[in-house]
């Protein structure tokens, strides 16, 4: 089981189960609730006291960090069952609702999800938008499904901005897996499209964050 070559930074968190106990057939996208780089995002999950992690962090600048290898289960969605079958991705976002992401982060997220699906044998990414239907569905060969943190805990994650883009993400990734090289701008997110990437000076500590 490989990891994405798109990762620009690697810092493995101790917060994980190794190995995962289920094949990868799910993508779970989260909002980080802070405009972090991939490096800073991975650093947040280093203390064992954090009791949380993810497989990848996507930074506001489009950087991608590997935090937990794909062969291992991250601690991300408040559901052991979901985490064992999902690749979890924390995406840099604003710190208030609807938790918008930058255009650079969105583009990197699309690239990363496409790469994950392709390497794990998926030709189609499915978004049902319904917890019961999704959890009852057994992905067929060549399929992966999308789940969200809010289904497993009293959280707003991934925020309405990214949540409203899930259908678009699934369609675009499926299109790319079919051989198309076209890209889609995030036109259906809450309150407009993804923001243009800007430079931030960020000083963050673990206690500052309200991840998920």
Predicted features, each with a name:
Residues 1-83:
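N-terminal catalytic cores of peptidoglycan-degrading enzymes
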Residues 26, 86, 145-147:
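Structural preference for beta-strand elements that scaffold enzyme active sites
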Residues 33, 70, 80-98, 114-118, ...:
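Cell-envelope and extracellular/periplasmic
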